[in-house]
UniProtKB/Swiss-Prot annotation:
This is N-succinylarginine dihydrolase. The gene is astB. The lineage of its organism: Bacteria, Pseudomonadati, Pseudomonadota, Gammaproteobacteria, Enterobacterales. Catalyzes the hydrolysis of N(2)-succinylarginine into N(2)-succinylornithine, ammonia and CO(2). Gene3D superfamilies: Succinylarginine dihydrolase. Keywords: Arginine metabolism, Hydrolase. Homodimer. One of its GO terms (molecular function) is N-succinylarginine dihydrolase activity. Substrate binds at residues 19-28, 110, 137-138, 212, 250, 359. Belongs to the succinylarginine dihydrolase family. The active site is at residues 174, 248, 365. It comes from Citrobacter koseri (strain ATCC BAA-895 / CDC 4225-83 / SGSC4696). Its EC number is 3.5.3.23. InterPro entries: AstB_sf (IPR037031), SuccinylArg_d-Hdrlase_AstB (IPR007079).
Amino acid sequence: MKAHEVNFDGLVGLTHHYAGLSFGNEASIQHRFQVSNPRLAAKQGLLKMKALADAGFPQAVIPPHERPFIPVLRQLGFSGQDEQVLEKVARQAPHWLSSVSSASPMWVANAATVCPSADALDGKVHLTVANLNNKFHRALEAPTTASLLRAIFRDAQFFAVHDALPQVALLGDEGAANHNRLGGDYGAPGIQLFVYGREEGVDTRPVRYPARQTREASEAVARLNQVNPHQVIFARQNPDVIDLGVFHNDVIAVSNRQVLFCHEQAFAKQGELMRQLRSRVAGFMPLEVPAREVSVQDAVATYLFNSQLLSRDDGSMVLVLPQECREHAGVWRYLNALLAADNPISDLRVFDLRESMANGGGPACLRLRVVLTEDELRAVNPAVMMNDTLFSTLNDWVDRYYRDRLTAADLADPQLLREGREALDTLTQLLNLGSVYPFQQEGAGNG
């Protein structure tokens, strides 16, 4: 059955700031306390969405979350009216304010893991929300992510959205950032590659930085998503590259159809994995980048592999890259050699995503890939699909509500909280989502 890969991109939130919250993510730590520009960040993301939609790649948007997230501050013992809660936490424990104000939900590659209907035992599209257990600021995301996904994929005839796994380290799950699908046409059954960094009872793990994904979590997600057991491979990421800042697999590898574009040091037992994929994926084409041409450190600094690999109708592929790749002589030289070589990649598209990149999120972090048949695509909430009208509407919305300068100190401003809630209230109407945010549900309950 004919199917399309639809990229659902996260819209950057109003509290986008640089707080260095993500240990193991080198860009996040490096840019701590830099002044951010939320308006520019949102517009950079929207420009990528629109450019890809205009190029014929189906594109949709996933809204930001409610931030600062007051309910969690109340759970941590801060009381009073919302404005009083903000004032108390800013004075007594400002690090909590930064955590509950993170705009990290923009990186929707971590929102969920997706199973297309062609791979599912029950023939539905499955999405299992990621618990993001390894980082406090990200572990807050799961309930709102589930609400948003259910408002977008609302037809139970076609879609099943599963809540996140229990919030324990044993079941740490980072979503689609540690998941790749390989095969032929999107609508045909494919092989799902789940990548993990640690496993209970196995000592081989990184030393410097945490391995966020467990094998136990990957196996549970595959079960929840009803992936046909004959179409699954579980592979361990090389712990040495995690220690070099490869905190998700999508920082060192990206797949599309029969192609796996990755660094030669991406996986533990990489030769064995490539043999397995060759035997199970017809026409499998690994594009393994040698360390002598691009080091792991340079791949992390430029986010070469945090790119999007997209298929055109003629079978050729486009590699969507951050501007940092073009600015690095060695990486750009490699990419031009790749373009000239015998493989499906026929075009490089470069985008300026500096606001997201400075927090450690490139093109691939910003998108959740969902393979949909024509019928399934028609069942998606149409208001989230990117087109000329939505692009214009969202740019106007950003201009109206977003600040062009934000520091950690600004997070205590009660006006920022009010601006954010008003903005999201408007957005839920624009995107026909209903009351998906806790502040909207509280308002309804108190009325």
